[in-house]
C-alpha cells in the first residue's frame, strides 16, 4: 500500500491535513479535514507542481498529463487533478473522503511531489459557461495548498 500526506498552509488562516492511500494499482482514497474556510463548496484539485515558493500561485495548473479540458471527477474528459468540490459547514470545516482512479501515488503519473489546492469558490465542473470553466472550473483564488509527500 502506498500512502501520502499533504499539510495545508495558507496566509489566510486556512489549515488542514490531507491523506492519500492506494492499494496496488487500485483507486486512490483521499481523506482529510480543512478548517478556516467560508461555508459552502470549494474547488479541490491536484496541481501540477509541488512548488510553493510564491505561495499557492506557484503550484502551476491542474495536474493534466493527458491534455484534456476541465471537468467533473466522474467525467471521461477531465484533468487528472480535477477532484470536484469539498463541502464546508457553518463552522468553517470540511471533513471528506474522495476516491479517484486518475491520481496514483506510484508510476509515471504519480501525484507525489505535486500540490493539492483548495480554492475560494465552487468548482463549476467545466459546465458553467464562464471563459475559465474548461480551464479551471472558475473556482476562484487559491486559499490553501500543500505538497503531497510520501508517508511511512
Swiss-Prot record:
Name of the protein this chain belongs to: Superoxide dismutase [Cu-Zn] 1
Binding positions for Zn(2+) per the UniProt entry: 62, 70, 79, 82
Compartment(s): Cytoplasm, Cytosol; Nucleus
Highest taxon of the lineage: Eukaryota
Disulfide bonds: 56-145
Complex formation: Homodimer. Interacts with DJ1A and CCS.
Keyword Oxidoreductase appears in the UniProt entry: yes
EC number from the UniProt entry: 1.15.1.1
Pfam families: Sod_Cu (PF00080)
Protein task: Destroys radicals which are normally produced within the cells and which are toxic to biological systems.
Keyword Mitochondrion carried by entry: no
Keywords: Antioxidant, Copper, Cytoplasm, Disulfide bond, Metal-binding, Nucleus, Oxidoreductase, Zinc
Tissue expr: Expressed in leaves (at protein level). The spatial localization is regulated by miR398-mediated silencing. Mostly present in flowers, old rosette leaves and inflorescence, and, to a lower extent, in cauline leaves, stems and roots.
GO terms for biological process, alphabetical: cellular response to copper ion; cellular response to light intensity; cellular response to oxidative stress; cellular response to ozone; cellular response to salt stress; cellular response to sucrose stimulus; cellular response to UV-B; defense response to bacterium
Cofactor binding summary note: Binds 1 copper ion per subunit. Binds 1 zinc ion per subunit.
Cofactors (names): Cu cation; Zn(2+)
GO molecular function term, any single one: copper ion binding
Sequence positions that bind Cu cation: 45, 47, 62, 119
Induction remarks: Upon photosynthetically active radiation (PAR) (e.g. light fluence) increase and UV-B treatment. Accumulates in response to ozone fumigation. Induced in response to oxidative stress, via a reduction of miR398-mediated silencing. Repressed by sucrose in a miR398-mediated silencing-dependent manner. Induced by salt stress.
Assigned protein family: Belongs to the Cu-Zn superoxide dismutase family.
Gene3D superfamilies: Superoxide dismutase, copper/zinc binding domain
Gene Ontology cellular component list: cytosol; nucleus
Reactions the enzyme catalyzes: 2 superoxide + 2 H(+) = H2O2 + O2
Enzyme class: oxidoreductase
InterPro entries membership: SOD-like_Cu/Zn_dom_sf, SOD_Cu/Zn_/chaperone, SOD_Cu/Zn_BS, SOD_Cu_Zn_dom
Organism: Arabidopsis thaliana
